Amino acid sequence: MSITKLARSNAFKPIPNFVRSSLRNAGVESSQNTEYPPYKPKKHHILATNLIVSYFEKGLVEEARSLFDEMPDRDVVAWTAMITGYASSNYNARAWECFHEMVKQGTSPNEFTLSSVLKSCRNMKVLAYGALVHGVVVKLGMEGSLYVDNAMMNMYATCSVTMEAACLIFRDIKVKNDVTWTTLITGFTHLGDGIGGLKMYKQMLLENAEVTPYCITIAVRASASIDSVTTGKQIHASVIKRGFQSNLPVMNSILDLYCRCGYLSEAKHYFHEMEDKDLITWNTLISELERSDSSEALLMFQRFESQGFVPNCYTFTSLVAACANIAALNCGQQLHGRIFRRGFNKNVELANALIDMYAKCGNIPDSQRVFGEIVDRRNLVSWTSMMIGYGSHGYGAEAVELFDKMVSSGIRPDRIVFMAVLSACRHAGLVEKGLKYFNVMESEYGINPDRDIYNCVVDLLGRAGKIGEAYELVERMPFKPDESTWGAILGACKAHKHNGLISRLAARKVMELKPKMVGTYVMLSYIYAAEGKWVDFARVRKMMRMMGNKKEAGMSWILVENQVFSFAVSDKMCPNASSVYSVLGLLIEETREAGYVPELDSLVNDQEVGT
């Protein structure tokens, strides 16, 4: 049995004794230039190098290093085996150290050494290391090696903030292969420049370069990144023309394109036409359904399982999010049980989805429990999800305490975290705390508050009745207030019966920005009614009738016996409507007996005014 076969067999043991013996006796080999007969074993360094490669293939990184250290003579092939092994095993820092040690000891790298160490520089995203290797490439005159040039281009495309350096290398390559083109297209796409990626793809086609399935998937991804379903359809047509429609990764990328661009009906049609489907296919469609039709996502999961597929963490994450969207607590709890039985409960992304689901379903204790179970794995999303859960249910003090605890644990908040804690302060009326966090955003963390943050603070002040301060903040905003800003002011004026100049100004601003927003007209009419200005009240209502404005009925969902039902305000067409309204009548009676008195000060009969 050869060394390589022995290494790959189940009987494989670290550093066999005969290899050690060969290494020890290496120094006493005859220096005569006699030719080895075909039956004589390979030289010691070749045996050791082959074994190093096998060690890395088996994942025995330390054994590979130990054997390498025992080699008395290390040629470029042995060094390259170590560097390539480290890079392939994701020990990128060790690959760089090994390369540095190799150069220091005077061994000149070859093109395979350089491409492997460039791969490690790319994986570490350390541009300075990659630039040093580039200098070695120039010094050794290996710039013409396509293997090295492709690796250098890949490194610059990944580590740089622009594609300038990668494009310079690309232009100097005289004979380009499919890897060259695909690397550049991928670089543009990953940097968020889908247009640049598609331009390179078009140039590739014009030069009649070989188009691989992987290159097509990147081009489709570039189309999706700029929401260009038209370009995606053109690529789809070329897929059929080139005979790649049986290539599942290509077909999955096209399905993802339709989903990301919001073409759900086309995505579903395409999905049903696909002859072959894998886990990625199903996950792609379920993920899109979670965003657009959560109840259908849950039904699709039933079909998924009926066809023998087994869910992974990504599947469960989409399903838990679907339950959160429609507040399907029972379904979410069932999924949680399955997640636990599958051993996925340690996955932090899934845990974050569960925290969010329980919070949106109003079950804060279970959100806290899941949050507590990942105490050693929490990331920024974990803290943010729990803060949002606290804030949306009025636990402002708990959200503030959690924010302070997060900061003290060494996690630096971002803009979304500040939005979460400010929103919690807004719902709980913690004005001073909210203003404190608003002020430290820029001074301590260097985060410039965006429009949403300003609107949140305006609403915080407005809800607390500090309408004058809220208006002053609007005046100081570094950008023009939008309809949400003025809407927050208007809502505060109505809630606190502040029916003066500010309320009318806010209403006028919202109507200018969103002239067809019916809620503004309704609110302004309420303000006029509260002030006793019935002429103005009638004028606003007449405007609404002339514009044909009618307030859109709100929609909601409810889960009954594992089936999701949707319903609207005053819905008489729902199943068992008579029973539903009978129960509603009983609930109204109970609320009255409990002492609830509805606010009727500004109530106007909508039927009379035609809205």
UniProtKB/Swiss-Prot annotation:
Signal peptide: none annotated. It holds the Pfam family PPR. Keywords: Repeat. InterPro entries: E_motif (IPR046848), Pentatricopeptide_rpt (IPR002885), PPR_At4g14850-like_plant (IPR046960), TPR-like_helical_dom_sf (IPR011990). Residues 485-561 are annotated as: Type E motif. One of its GO terms (molecular function) is RNA binding. GO terms for cellular component: mitochondrion. One of its GO terms (biological process) is response to abscisic acid. It comes from the Eukaryota. PPR repeats lie at residues 44-74, 75-109, 110-144, 145-176, 177-211, 212-246, 247-281, 282-311, 312-346, 347-377, 379-413, 414-444, 450-480. Belongs to the PPR family. PCMP-E subfamily. This is Putative pentatricopeptide repeat-containing protein At1g56570.
